[in-house]
Amino acid sequence: TGYDLEMGIVTTIEANVKEPGEIVLNAKLLSNMISRMPAGQISILSADNGKTTIKSGVAEFEIQSMAATDFPDLPNTGAEETLTIPTGVLRDMIDRTLYAVSQDEKKPAHTGELFESEPDKLTIVALDGYRLAIVERPVEAIKEIRIIVPSKTMNEVSHLLANDDEETVHISANRRYVVFTTAGYTIMSRLIEGEFLNYHNVIPNGSRTSVVLDTKEFIETIERASLIITERLKNPLRISFTEGKVVVRCQTNLGRVVDEFNAQCEGDEVEIGFNNRYLLDALRNARTEKVRMEISGPLSPVKVLPAEGNDFLYLVLPVRFKNCLLYTSPSPRD
């Protein structure tokens, strides 16, 4: 059992126990020692003087332990079962949204992920004021919930869940706690209090420009352009969506770059600015061969969706150029 008063993790493993008992060990020290032990069985011996010996092969550690009575009790959460979902599906949902969680402690509700369950689907949402990530999957929920789970908890859940759709994880929740139960692990966590943004209100309706493009090709183009962008030189990418192609430009004190690739563009031609990292995060987490970008206006959030289906929706805010953003109707090119 591990518990830091905000999150607790309980796991059970098979062992040849010669004498039952309880001790408390430094978690980080124990983890580092075990990870560096030679392959094979590990023996743990605790003495009455508070010394604990951990041995594997010829490697042997002796460390100070603490009394189990000093360890805080896990709370009785009273959480009610809400839904069951394949572990691989939940892990994928978490991994595809965590990048957009806010780091701004002044808005604590946005430092976690919104879990929203309806009778037939689970939605996970993250946002930081510059981008928004929404992933939905079909489920059969016993109870509808709307809770905010700390990003630290989500990281641990993702790390511990098997990437296997044959195994399942049971999610239980109430107004204060959430509990994830799967084969081998139980993870409980306090929830974040506060009101999560009504994200539906920030999603643009319709679009003036729709672009279907190859995800890998777009990522590689942005990565090349990003070579002249540094933490000190954060000039935006200037990206033009025109008939049949996407043109990426950037200029900093290190130099300038122009690159392009073919794409299926419909509607008005547009040139718009992007933070390279924010756009890359959305594209890398799309995990699909082609994406569709929908642009409603020069200063409106840009939607990134799968070319087919609707299992995710990412929003990326554009960056205003020092001069004005350009938004024009198509015109013949030389």
Predicted regions and their residues:
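A short, hydrophobic C-terminal helix/tail in secreted or cell-surface proteins
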Residues: 330-334
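Structural preference for solvent-exposed beta-strand-turn elements
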Residues: 1-329
